[in-house]
Swiss-Prot record:
GO terms for molecular function: calcium ion binding. It is found in: Cytoplasm. Pfam families: TCTP. Residues 1-170 form the TCTP domain. It comes from Scophthalmus maximus (Turbot). This is Translationally-controlled tumor protein homolog. Keywords: Calcium, Cytoplasm. Belongs to the TCTP family. InterPro entries: Mss4-like_sf, Mss4/transl-control_tumour, TCTP, Translation_control_tumour_CS, Translational_control_tumour_p. GO terms for cellular component: cytoplasm.
Length: 170
């Protein structure tokens, strides 16, 4: 399995269990998810009680969570931006990412800078369609994943900057 982690924060963003394709000339990765509902039962032994010694045993209710599998599986955290805030964030993020690329992958910098302009314009043009998610550490200087839905209104997709990710093989 391959885990895609945020280059700046180290947060796990998604894995290769999803359909992944490149957009905007390889600048963005589109990750296709699914809406899911999962039930997580609570193990009675975790409470240390002896159910046979109880007069009336109440069944523990299971915790039910539903949402997009990418978000639930990788513990992404919802965050809010208005267009002005996101514009300020993305400008700083692009600068930080360019600096990191200059250190780690200098031959990729020119292609990143050239492609990032178009990707950011596309994102700002569709700004009202997106929901925003940070990694588990909630580092707002790191990558913010963008949630949207396909034209069918059912299939969730998330966008991530490819150059802002590092790959970890498990």
């Amino acid at each position: 399995m391959i885990i895609y982690k945020d280059l700046l924060s180290g947060d796990e963003m998604f894995s290769n269990i999803y359909k992944i394709r490149e957009l905007e000339g390889g600048i963005l990765l589109e990750v296709e998810g699914k809406r899911i509902t999962r039930t997580e039962a609570i193990d009675d032994s975790a409470f240390g009680a002896n159910p046979s010694a109880e007069e009336l045993s109440e069944a523990n209710e299971a915790a039910v969570s539903s949402g997009v599998d990418i978000i639930l599986n990788h513990k992404l955290i919802s965050t809010l931006y208005n267009k002005k805030q996101y514009s300020a964030y993305i400008k700083k993020y692009m600068k930080d990412l360019k600096t990191k690329l200059e250190e780690t992958n200098p031959e990729r910098v020119d292609a990143f800078v050239a492609g990032a302009v178009g990707a950011v314009k596309m994102i700002l043009g569709k700004f009202k369609d997106f929901e925003f998610y940070t990694g588990e550490s909630m580092n707002h200087d790191a990558m913010v994943g963008l949630l949207d839905y396909r034209e069918d209104g059912i299939t969730p997709i998330m966008l991530f900057f490819k150059d802002g990710l590092e790959i970890e093989k498990c």
